[in-house]
């Protein structure tokens, strides 16, 4: 039972054989090729499409009242629209060898590093590594050698399905900053889960991607404020700021 575990210590809800939900696998720290990443993300999205089909069949087969069926099909129509958005964003923005795919993988790198340090900062494990004669700083080779079962032995740290989907849904909103992107400007994606569901990691991933995009796309003009975080409670604002600044 992980329901009482801290947010970033809950095991991700993996889909069946979904290696592409593993954060380190998606990052620049893994040996996975761009094509393998794209293929995995395609399978991830198609799993959502398959789920929608199953739900539609379930509604049709069950003895629901007409008004109940209408509500169900309306919601599934919205799901289908998001499924099409996911496919469009992947095909349009995450192209093999593109800068956008590099930004996406670097975002996963930053999330993995943040999680690793969040777990081991001040602990004996990290002190032992720093005292080791072979320690050469916190560079790419160091993080490549780190195990990714950070919070639970044997389970790779990864995105929950809704977190990865939320990031993919917003690729166009971040990577396409042309002012005439009117269709996208009409959409606002809201992620809602009870406390401990993983909302923070989902939008921290987007913030990281936004920062990387601005700096890589606009160089020195890409500095400055990239995201504004505001909460209704002052203590919550402080807590979330501490988490975001790790």
Predicted regions, residues:
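N-terminal helicase ATP-binding lobe
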Residues: 1-246
């Amino acid at each position: 039972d992980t329901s009482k575990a801290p947010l970033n210590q809950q095991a991700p809800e993996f889909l069946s054989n979904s290696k592409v939900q593993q954060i380190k696998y998606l990052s620049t720290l893994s040996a996975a090729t761009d094509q393998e990443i794209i293929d995995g993300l395609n399978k991830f999205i198609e799993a959502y499409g398959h789920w929608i089909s199953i739900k539609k069949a379930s509604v049709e087969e069950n003895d629901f009242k007409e008004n109940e069926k209408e509500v169900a099909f309306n919601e599934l129509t919205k799901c289908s629209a998001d499924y099409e958005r996911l496919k469009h964003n992947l095909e349009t923005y995450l192209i093999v060898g593109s800068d956008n795919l590099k930004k996406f993988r670097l975002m996963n790198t930053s999330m993995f590093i943040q999680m690793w340090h969040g777990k081991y900062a001040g602990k004996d494990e990290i002190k032992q590594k720093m005292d080791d004669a072979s320690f050469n700083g916190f560079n790419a080779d160091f993080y490549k050698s780190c195990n990714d079962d950070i919070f639970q032995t044997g389970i790779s740290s990864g995105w929950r399905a809704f977190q990865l989907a939320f990031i993919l849904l917003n690729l166009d909103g971040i990577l396409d900053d042309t002012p005439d992107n009117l269709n996208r400007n009409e959409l606002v994606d809201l992620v809602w889960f009870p406390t401990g569901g993983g909302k923070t990691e989902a939008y921290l991933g987007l913030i990281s991607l936004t920062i990387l995009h601005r700096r890589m796309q606009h160089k020195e003009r890409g500095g400055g404020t990239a995201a504004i975080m505001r909460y209704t409670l002052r203590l919550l604002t402080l807590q979330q700021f501490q988490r975001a600044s790790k």
